[in-house]
């Protein structure tokens, strides 16, 4: 039996990380956490996750800088990255996608929203 995909949750809010972890674990996925982009980049140098749920606004290194750094790394597998933020302007969404994000979700989100995105990117199947 193969291991379940590893999902890296990157958010400066411990509450958001916990909520996302609870959802991902309930879907049978493995999780790891980072509280800012720099920690996420360091984590990915050691262990390449299959999926990254990445907040935009964080200290140390913001999400878009982290995304660009991740896309500049030779990661195997290349992680699926879903940007997650309160920023909803079309310019922000375009910037995230042009920087290498695979998808984009708005905060606050719930289990159904995250499940839909995970299904869209092929990480889980919708029941």
Task: Put a short name on every predicted segment.
Residues 18-26:
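Charged docking surfaces used in two-component/phosphorelay signaling
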Residues 33-42, 63-65:
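Helix N-cap/capping motif at the beta->alpha junctions
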Residues 47-53:
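Active-site beta3 strand of CheY-like receiver
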Residues 58:
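Receiver (REC) domain active-site loop signature in two-component systems and cognate sites
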Residues 65, 88-103:
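Alpha4 helix (beta4-alpha4-beta5 surface) of REC/receiver domains from two-component response regulators
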